[in-house]
Amino acid sequence: MSEYIRVTEDENDEPIEIPSEDDGTVLLSTVTAQFPGACGLRYRNPVSQCMWGVRLVEGILHAPEAGWGNLVYVVNYPKDNKRKMDETDASSAVKVKRAVQKTSDLIVLGLPWKTTEQDLKEYFSTFGEVLMVQVKKDIKTGHSKGFGFVRFTDYETQVKVMSQRHMIDGRWCDCKLPNSKQSPDEPLRSRKVFVGRCTEDMTADELQQFFAQYGEVVDVFIPKPFRAFAFVTFADDQVAQSLCGEDLIIKGISVHISNAEPKHNSNRQLERGGRFGGNPGGFGNQGGFGNSRGGGGGLGNNQGSNMGGGMNFGAFSINPAMMAAAQAALQSSWGMMGMLASQQNQSGPSGNNQPQGNMQREQNQGFSSGNNSYGGSNSGAAIGWGSASNAGSSSGFNGGFGSSMDSKSSGWGM
């Protein structure tokens, strides 16, 4: 006649009664049906209080000499299975520990000035139960300082809130652990990645669908106006870190993934002056090379070329003192030319020379000093500072400042 014996995995657990065979033995298959992986039974001896093993022969468990009795029998497992079970129990304990981890205050940055504590509580209540909200205010004025604190009941809610950006009263805000609350040996890794080389036809939905293949995406942010990059926030920081440094193909375009943490840029921008183009002292504007007009006096298509505060001729520069000396020399030279021209006019025109007074001033030709223009109809293509060749006794610039009549030249040769 069969009887029921009490069997359990642990002495402290509630036992299960399993039936025996008609001959009083218990089949090992009967035990493994209730306890998969079991390989035997043991029990605590009432006299010695030591654990005794039950005899097993060809898959059949034989009762002790005194019979099965009311003892509680503990299941035996192979060592490998026991080790796996211990590891499973340890991992389960870690999961339970994480699940019951206490929440902490979160700092909310970037709050609008008009946001009140009630507004803050109503917003975060959509994520879960809120224990506390506080908007920091100035003691003297009573106005908001633009940040506050919030605490939730559940740790899962806290993690979810920290993993995304929040639009509060029309403004994007960030919610994170304060620096003082962050453990130094367990730094909070970023769940956000920077996606560079984006194109304008990439939408937030398309980015979310693409990155969803790597893990849960909680937020996608594309700055407005478009700046060729975006931010993607994952629920798991390990997914975000695994993608950093990768080049991925989205809609046929190669994008680069990097960490979204702010970096200190050691490269300073150049000063406004001295850049290439559009600034004083640079290339392409006043006092430089290019299309300067008026008071810069650069080489090129200068119009007017007033002798102002210094000129640059390639590597050769003229300061105001040298310019004043040049003006004095030119005035002296042109004074002598005026006297010679008046003497020639009294004796009548000769050759191709024309009176000094009838000389026409052409744009981009000649040299301008104050309101006086010097040039010549036969002075050739006299552009800028003396590049024309003289014809006869014409009054042009021949590679220097001053005048050249016949074989006589006065001024500075260059």
Swiss-Prot record:
Single GO term (MF): DNA binding
Compositional bias ranges of the Basic and acidic residues kind: 261-274
Superkingdom of origin: Eukaryota
Function summary: Probably involved in transcriptional repression. May play a role in the maintenance of the circadian clock periodicity.
Region (Disordered): 261-303, 341-373
Protein's recorded name: TAR DNA-binding protein 43
Keywords: Biological rhythms, Cytoplasm, DNA-binding, Mitochondrion, mRNA processing, mRNA splicing, Nucleus, Repeat, Repressor, RNA-binding, Transcription, Transcription regulation
Native species: Gallus gallus (Chicken)
Residue ranges annotated for the RRM domain, each copy included: 104-200, 191-262
Record Pfam families: RRM_1, TDP-43_C, TDP-43_N
Domain notes: The RRM domains can bind to both DNA and RNA.
Biased composition, class Gly residues, residue ranges: 275-303
Keyword Cytoplasm carried by entry: yes
Gene designation: TARDBP
Subcellular compartments: Nucleus; Cytoplasm; Cytoplasm, Stress granule; Mitochondrion
CC terms in the record's Gene Ontology section: chromatin; cytoplasmic stress granule; mitochondrion; nucleoplasm
Signal peptide: none
The keyword Repeat is assigned to this record: yes
A biological process term (GO) from this entry: mRNA processing
Ranges of Low complexity composition bias in the record: 342-373
Assembly and interaction partners: Homodimer.
